[in-house]
Amino acid sequence: MDVPEPQPDPDGGDGPGHEPGGSPQDELDFSILFDYDYLNPIEEEPIAHKAISSPSGLAYPDDVLDYGLKPCNPLASLSGEPPGRFGEPDSIGFQNFLSPVKPAGASGPSPRIEITPSHELMQAGGALRGRDAGLSPEQPALALAGVAASPRFTLPVPGYEGYREPLCLSPASSGSSASFISDTFSPYTSPCVSPNNAGPDDLCPQFQNIPAHYSPRTSPIMSPRTSLAEDSCLGRHSPVPRPASRSSSPGAKRRHSCAEALVAPLPAASPQRSRSPSPQPSPHVALQDDSIPAGYPPTAGSAVLMDALNTLATDSPCGIPSKIWKTSPDPTPVSTAPSKAGLARHIYPTVEFLGPCEQEERRNSAPESILLVPPTWPKQLVPAIPICSIPVTASLPPLEWPLSNQSGSYELRIEVQPKPHHRAHYETEGSRGAVKAPTGGHPVVQLHGYMENKPLGLQIFIGTADERILKPHAFYQVHRITGKTVTTTSYEKIVGNTKVLEIPLEPKNNMRATIDCAGILKLRNADIELRKGETDIGRKNTRVRLVFRVHVPEPSGRIVSLQAASNPIECSQRSAHELPMVERQDMDSCLVYGGQQMILTGQNFTAESKVVFMEKTTDGQQIWEMEATVDKDKSQPNMLFVEIPEYRNKHIRVPVKVNFYVINGKRKRSQPQHFTYHPVPAIKTEPSDEYEPSLICSPAHGGLGSQPYYPQHPMLAESPSCLVATMAPCQQFRSGLSSPDARYQQQSPAAALYQRSKSLSPGLLGYQQPSLLAAPLGLADAHRSVLVHAGSQGQGQGSTLPHTSSASQQASPVIHYSPTNQQLRGGGHQEFQHIMYCENFGPSSARPGPPPINQGQRLSPGAYPTVIQQQTAPSQRAAKNGPSDQKEALPTGVTVKQEQNLDQTYLDDVNEIIRKEFSGPPSRNQT
């Protein structure tokens, strides 16, 4: 058999396996022609028109001849680097790259070339051993690493976990780690194929000065190749190459371990290997511009390379979505010492690689610079939809954390709410469509206040709708809807065992998105109820909310997280016409006495609908239940008129929160609604519809006692009486005593506004101190009784208060005060003697004789220092005569008058009031 003459090396070198006396098999090794001869220096320029033969002896297609081989000059300056640096493999050999030499011709498919090693090189004990046998003693490890790894300057690319989820097809539907850039299996246009309107020469003009190793290498089907394998990047492997295993990909490509030829202890191991970006930005690879690892020499060649790659990654003319990448705050330099972990130095630990806007960072990963590759998108994206790019160095709040929908100028708002009922579908049945809006469309969400031109990602998940803090629902998850009518791009992902749907928010749409791709999936109750720590019951927890969350990056590096939740959605499989539903209530609180009317608006109300109030403890035990009275005459199918029941405890000191629900039958009840009972304030008020708002006293802010004073609450009165006949404001003065026998002096003249009370005492009387007095009052005589009344201007000798209304005189109570009355001076409240005056009191009421009395005040002689006496006139109460009479009933001015000579008759009147109070039954109009 004639042995052909060995062809000379295209670069003028003999190759590592060419030694004198070498076997013919070594000379016939064609791998030296294909980028695997890197132990000899560059001697001459390659011949562009030289034919290249395949290992089988058949010529490659003609388009291979369109490209010549040129030496790699940009990285030639790396030759001075010591072993173990990134440039060291390039310094010991030459590199080839492809350059277009064919003149521009007819437009057609661009050539795709894969220079692969020979078949013999892949077999253990083949030509590789023969070549290694001829190496010098100081170069065996270097040649071993170089032959199998084809050293080149590359970017680190993670393991296969970053490209696909378990049990899911890769973006290219292939088990091969390199097939994701194949146009045959990838959902995207292959980065290796140039645009149709470009000539063959314009495949990659930016790469004309870059070695061929930086271009994507897509091997033809059934062609052996060396590439990163997705299943063996992190394990310890033998330095001896082993026979390659068959791949499960459709193309039946060979795959070889990236670590089987890269030995960790070898100081000359190849640096990180990666496919570099293609002329079109790849959907899986992005380049970061500031993450050159420490230890890489800042040479001119590296600058040219990085600039070219950055241009490709940033200036993208196509519509493939942009990627995110993570910048480590302190990238770890590549160590030159041998690795102790047994791993190749260029392999990073396994980390999770996140999709667009996904911020779930691996907490335990070491600081590093890595590429973030998004997971597969189930459907092909429409052109020109870039997805947001957010650094993931900062941890984001988990889904269980409650977030506000507004922060600063940003606000996430649900413009169109979903329908209150949506039939969720089970895992074993078909989809029931996306959640719809009451108007017939779909919910709409918009982010307000965002002024940047970068898109963001809107996350959607299903949350709870009960009285507890909003969190992901245990029995329902979001479901991605696809179809011809779906216009919103979306994809699913898992965040903390919760399925999340992510859609883009784009500035061109004013950061507004229509949610037409989100359905609701019902999980099996048994699967969730048997989960450890789960206490909810699936059949009783059928109400959900659509929760929307967005993360807004700020120029300062801070990330603002906003969250908005929709109205409750009933997902029960029962008919929506069976269960009553409360959509609105006109009031959510009242006093413990109840009695007020509440209007409920909703759906599916019937004539038999009942409203039940109940209270539960923190541990879920029911301690109170009361059925409210429903006005069946006024009630409608969508409206109920309910009288609020009285709370079980009328002496509460703090507000109590209870729930109520509408029930149509045994199991047809609405979701619980919230209601609050407030304690009785220090001063109660008349119903607000009987008086003008201008006549209602303002809420008091303090009191002499320890009981709190709550704001004015409208309530139904048991009787129409009031302390003051026309609900005119009453004021109170506080005076203090220095000693029991000292003269009374006005210490702090202040007025107190109070409204209505069944009993007045210093411990219960709330008051405030408005500036009502023109001058302080002085009480000089301790034995002087004071008559305080309202009359015409200039009648009194005290200070005059501001005018209030017209001067019609009506009956009004008279307040007597005498410090000499021993019955009133006794008790522990002697220091707080109160002088009260009332409006709407005529001068004719000041008379020497005892008046006719029809009502009095409950007073304890030893504890209460004030006495209130009311007189009546033939005229009716001003409050009963309408607004016009009410305005006329008020006096023009209020005067505090000090009478100089009062006889004992007034003291007798005081004693008579007390005797009648305690001897006879209380009158109907008593306050």
Curated annotation (Swiss-Prot):
The keyword NADP does not apply. One of its GO terms (biological process) is calcineurin-NFAT signaling cascade. Residues 394-576 form the RHD domain. Residues 163-177 are annotated as: Required for cytoplasmic retention of the phosphorylated form. A motif (Nuclear localization signal) lies at residues 253-255. The modification Phosphoserine is found at residues 23, 53-54, 56, 99, 107, 110, 136, 150, 170, 173-174, 176-177, 179, 182, 215, 219, 223, 238, 245, 257, 270, 276, 278, 282, 328, 365, 757, 759, 761, 860. Residues 1-29, 203-299, 322-341, 790-812, 841-903 are annotated as: Disordered. Residues 423-430 bind DNA. Its main location: cytoplasm. Residues 111-116 are annotated as: Calcineurin-binding. Sequence repeats lie at residues 186-202, 215-231, 274-290. SUPFAM superfamilies: E set domains (SSF81296), p53-like transcription factors (SSF49417). Residues 216-226, 798-812 have a biased composition (Polar residues). Residues 267-277 have a biased composition (Low complexity). Expressed in spleen, heart, testis, brain, placenta, muscle and pancreas. Expressed in the thymus. Expressed in the lung. Expressed in cartilage. The keyword Ligase does not apply. PROSITE patterns: REL_2 (PS50254). Residues 186-292 are annotated as: 3 X approximate SP repeats. GO terms for molecular function: chromatin binding; DNA-binding transcription activator activity, RNA polymerase II-specific; DNA-binding transcription factor activity; DNA-binding transcription factor activity, RNA polymerase II-specific; DNA-binding transcription repressor activity, RNA polymerase II-specific; phosphatase binding; RNA polymerase II cis-regulatory region sequence-specific DNA binding; sequence-specific DNA binding. Disruption phenotype: NFATC2-knocked down adult animals develop progressive difficulty in ambulation, fixed joint contractures and reduced joint motion, associated with joint destruction and the formation of ectopic cartilage and bone masses. Skeletal morphogenesis is normal during embryonic development. Cartilage cells from NFATC2-knocked down mice display uncontrolled growth consistent with malignant transformation. Plays a role in the inducible expression of cytokine genes in T cells, especially in the induction of the IL-2, IL-3, IL-4, TNF-alpha or GM-CSF. Promotes invasive migration through the activation of GPC6 expression and WNT5A signaling pathway. Is involved in the negative regulation of chondrogenesis. Recruited by AKAP5 to ORAI1 pore-forming subunit of CRAC channels in Ca(2+) signaling microdomains where store-operated Ca(2+) influx is coupled to calmodulin and calcineurin signaling and activation of NFAT-dependent transcriptional responses. Member of the multicomponent NFATC transcription complex that consists of at least two components, a pre-existing cytoplasmic component NFATC2 and an inducible nuclear component NFATC1. Other members such as NFATC4, NFATC3 or members of the activating protein-1 family, MAF, GATA4 and Cbp/p300 can also bind the complex. The phosphorylated form specifically interacts with XPO1; which mediates nuclear export. NFATC proteins bind to DNA as monomers. Interacts with NFATC2IP. Interacts with FOXP3. Interacts with TBX21 ('Thr-302' phosphorylated form). Interacts with KAT2A. This is Nuclear factor of activated T-cells, cytoplasmic 2. It comes from Mus musculus (Mouse). The gene is Nfatc2.
